[in-house]
């Protein structure tokens, strides 16, 4: 299965089958095990990754850089200031040039169309490190974390409470393909994109999953195995922050919300978190929080993607 992924792009989990996603999860578990035992597996010795960042990041940058190093490879960080792409060079030219230098390209940017165009013209695998539409590398770390703490994915009830953003788009696709019940609670007007809803529902039908959309966060949280949230205002939405705070007041993951979930529910957040807004400090630091395990798993999920594709 993993051999079939060699040379592939990782733009969205919609492009990956259930078995392929499971294979990546299994590889991440294996690589994490080696790391914990202090065993160095230089699977990517001599390989180089170019990392294009038009959006700043802590976890994505450090986890991919550390991941390449741990697998014996090298990562080059390229900000907007480092690239001619920001000065008018077409994405197609950048893709062709970088393909002559490196073995893979990671890009974190705003428009999904930029990632798709980069992949179209690149001769090496392109990895989507985040766009306004998708966050597929985060989603892989998320399902890895659920497997670690719950032992299974099929039938898991995940309640995402908050903004219908790129994170939940990728969670819906991953959950649908893996047979999970993904409940999404947003205020009216903040729902996931219609195309993502339809796509995810189709994937759910094919794989025994379920996608449920509601406006009542308590309805979503009732009996859930996983409570998941993200910031209410994403990067680029700073001007909307105050309005969003008002609109999302009832969507905070707090002790009362946690009481509605299953007694053994886990709490997840992709970070960075605004404590006291979408999640309380008490819940984030509480015994049911796996937020920092989830953050750690970015490293191992990303290593699995790199090892499989490069």
Spell out what each predicted region is.
Residues 96, 103-174, 269:
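Anion-binding alpha/beta catalytic cores of soluble intermediary-metabolism enzymes, centered on
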Residues 264-265, 271-310:
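Adenosine-phosphate binding glycine-rich loop
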Residues 202-282:
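Rossmann-like adenosine-cofactor binding region
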